[in-house]
Amino acid sequence: MTKTLIIAALLTLTGCFNSDNTDTVLPDDPIETQPIGRIGGFVEDLSGQPLSNVLVSTETEVAYTADDGSYTLENVSPDDNIVIKFTKSGYASNYEVVELIGWETATSNTALMGIGGVATFNSTETSQITLDDVTVDFQANSFIDGVSGNPYTGNVMVEITHVDPTTDELDAAPRDLSAIGSDGSSQLVSYGMVDITLYGIDGEVLTVNPDMPANIKIPITNGSLNEDYQLSVGDTQSTWSFSPERGIWVEESVGTITGDEDGLFFTFEAPHFSWWNCDQGFVPSCASGRVIDFVGFPVRSAEVTCAGGQTTSTVTTDEDGYYVCSVMVGDYVSFTASTFVGGRDWHKTKGAIFMDSEGSSAADCEPIPDIQIDVCRIAGTVNVENYEASLNEDSSETVAADGLSAVFWEPPGDISYCNNPLDSLQVGECWSGTNDEIISNYPESSWPGIPASARSAGLWFEVSNAHGSYRMERTLQGVLPFYAWQTHSDENGDIVTDRPEFNQGDLLAVSAAGDSGAYFGPWAVADIAEIPSQVFFSSNSLTATGGNLLVDYTNASGDDVFFAAAAGDEQVLCRFEEAGAFSVPAHALSSLPAGFGGASVFNLSLELAPGPDGLPIYTQIYSGQSVPLSIE
């Protein structure tokens, strides 16, 4: 797992980066680009084993699953009805539908079912094929090319796969059971499904002439359906086919229920071939809720599957993490939310919950408690330094030492990356040693530095307050992007200092140009954070004489206050309970070499805020003072 920058070991190190191998990328005017996003997920067989080399396709993009069954479709244009097709030799094709809101990664997982049976016959002859308990009667010379519509003559290969909807086989059926009936939208209750695919001798997809339909008989079952829903011999029932273009089940005609000693069957005519379904359509009720991540931020474009005895519905969360799914009143329904982060599937299930609502709109929906997925989606940090430095021990004169930096990264997934790094340093504890030794005290997930997964938020990133706007150009350390305010510049041989101005109580706003290559859209948030109270030493300098160092200070706020010191290569970092004074233990200072160094005292605010595309980011704000430190 990549190491993520969350907090610097010392204030004086925050926002400071090695200038070696660093190139500044000068910004052009931001270019308005259309949003693009990604769709990711996993494909499994019905036993839960990952399927590799599955072709995953939309109208414009294709990808193949890896060995672990994962896939990512890149550069997908947002749409509220993106149909995804999943195809692999030896398996019945499947379809899912997802909504992509903007720049984020939408989630779509699916399962494929092995083909039930394969047969070959001559297109010029009347043929009856029975495979997987399904019987199909084809008329002679009834076949046409599925693309051109031209008549086809030659051998035909047929693949037939039957689905019993009372089993896990339903997971391999297209989308969910949302449908468009003759009287409007419906929620289907299925009794049996079949996928029939026809191929010519050259692998071309075939279908039948609509004027010469095939006759199909499939096994059906009432399962554990309520008596009101059960079918009997002699009943008629609607036929429904799945439309790959529209991504929904469509009512077509009617068929007849027959039966024998082997059970019930559904017989109907098929004027074309795709997935077919024996169903009843009902006006559904609805259930609504929200999906959040480990730190409580809404998860947009998560996949939510609502499944019960009569309910099968899959939907996508909106930009605020909310969803509405179709449910059947009187059903017990489980709600499973999934999101694709860091190349892994993260999910959580809530339920089963009894559906007693009869609402037909989101305002009347059965309320579902938040589904919290244990996934870390923190994607960056903005570091602000509100800082004053005393020039020498004999003067009260101070200079501003404010600073600013930011870095963004791919969300890691594992919740260890969401642990508050400040919790590693206990109240009353001090760390001493070199920079590397102090850093090693933090959990590995919080080590400072630019992470290997760093990504660009655009050509520039800007922080604003009442005093001005501070735009930082994107800079690269090697190939890793970050943003840092350039405090010093060389103008004709003169070193010019230019610092941002921050003061306690300032409200900060942020904005960024966005970067389509990193799937970050243009971003602007007002009042994202407030500068905390600025802590000041009670004296202009400190002297360490070998014993404990008593430090008095003013203007702290909150429960804790931080102290840092540095001399040569040695450093100290402490955390104390806020009481107006603290004592730095002698052992913590013993590693500092004799001579002069520096000490700082500060409030440290580490909060989560909405970042690019709604992902949580840290705002890390230091507010304090530094003074000379004499070590005897």
Residue ranges, per PLM feature:
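Structural motif
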Residues: 30-52, 286-301, 382-394, 556
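C-terminal motif of bacterial Sec signal peptides marking the signal peptidase cleavage site
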Residues: 13-15
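Bacterial signal peptide processing site
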Residues: 17-20
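Short, ordered, surface-exposed loop/turn motifs in non-cytosolic proteins
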Residues: 37-39, 45-60, 67, 77-79, ...
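A short, solvent-exposed loop/turn motif at the edges and junctions
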Residues: 58, 77-103, 111-113, 328, ...
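Proteolytic cleavage junctions
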Residues: 25-29, 39, 68, 109-131, ...
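Solvent-exposed N-terminal domain segments of exported/luminal and surface proteins
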Residues: 123, 376-502
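Short helix-loop boundary/capping segments
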Residues: 153-162, 166-167, 174, 530-585
